């Protein structure tokens, strides 16, 4: 999860913070929406790779060491972590730290509620924990985007120039993230 978040921060969030403030509010929202769609595509790719990687590893090392049922919750946790991270960065970009605090409070509350439910149901295992993280991340991310007013799937024009500029900024950060890890 942390490696996926670091790569997405380098490829998307850092360019968003560098590019968006240079424009007026409407263009800034359009840039951020286009970058969100790009980040969503990257997250789906990372989630798919995580899903297939867990299944392949489970098959090789045995289901006892790494159950294949871990694949779905982990892949969804990658998507939830991404949604929450993007909502946080966008709220910080808009200089709304109270919304970031509300988003983090919601996330932590949902994770703790899910873990408490797992303990109460005597069902607390790896799949349950990743499921709690996924659910909390997706809920907090959706709430955060809704609160900031970003509509990433609306019409925001063509994104080629934004993607080109983001790649020009992010391509140098990705190798440093890989080396750091």
Language model segments and positions:
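Transmembrane-helix boundary and interhelical linker motifs in polytopic inner-membrane proteins
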Residues: 4-38, 93-98
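Hydrophobic/aromatic residues in alpha-helical transmembrane segments
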Residues: 12-16, 53, 87-88, 114-115, ...
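Hydrophobic faces of transmembrane alpha-helices in multi-pass small-molecule transporters and flippases
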Residues: 36, 40, 71-75, 98-105, ...
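Alpha-helical transmembrane segments of multi-pass membrane transport and lipid-handling proteins
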Residues: 36-63, 73, 113-120, 142
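Hydrophobic alpha-helical transmembrane segments
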Residues: 67-75, 101-151
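Membrane-interface junctions at transmembrane-helix termini in multi-pass inner-membrane proteins
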Residues: 79-102
